[in-house]
Amino acid sequence: RHLAKVEVASSSLVIRSIPFPHRLFALMRFFVFGGDFLNELLSLVRKAVDKYRMIEEGDCIAVGVSGGKDSLCLLAALGELKRFYPKKFTLKAIMVDPCFFGNPTDYSEITELCRRLYIEPVIKTTQLYEIIFQVRKESNPCSMCARMRRGILHDAARAAGCNKIALGHNTDDAVETFFMNLLQGGKIGCFQPVTYLSRKDITMIRPLIYVSERQTENLSKKLNLPIIKSPCPADGNTAREQAKLFAKDLDKTYGKVYEKIIGALERRRIDGWTDEDPSKLRRKSKPGT
């Protein structure tokens, strides 16, 4: 069996065949090493998946893999979940390479991880760094980069035959987004656990919404995941980083701030969040009820 590694440079498409041998024992060692950490992650991921009905029978899900701890934990969790989840689905790992400083990113260790998880890796090479930092010289590069990466990811997922995209946004990300919307935009809001994009005809899911950044950090170390440190010049100097520090300060003062804000989003049903249990949601979705 073979996997297709897809590289897109400008408008050209190059497909290279990658051997895909069975590596059952390597896969078993990978997950046994994670121990209770992986079980805890899987429990929280399944809670989100079940509650918001993120996965349906026959889904082909593109996992957006940046190379950070969150996206790699998501890749590992969904790779394990698909082995026993009652609804059968397939996974593809899509990496959008910005080519920082004109250099392609080395994804070899991540593609090896994909082989161990029986997931097809797809790499899309772009000129994002050149466009944003050298051509346009953006004063606010993060916003533009995020928009462009999303568009590229959406198109790559559709081209790969996927109907859903899984993103690695965790509990901390949700709380930081809440504060950014409140303090910068003067509105109460957050990203949605599940979002259907009608223009792209694709659904975004966020299975890590109940997983904290501390948990993904611990698990990524325990599993020795192949994290790629971001060489982005703007890394660590963003509005989100300020929101992160603000949330941490509040948590030190008041305690359980992250859980409280997630609970408030769900109780008030803000932006698709809900506090209803999955069984009630399913009953409501049945025709004639």
What is the predicted role of each segment?
Residues 5-7, 36, 284:
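Intrinsically disordered, low-complexity polyampholyte segments enriched for Lys and acidic residues
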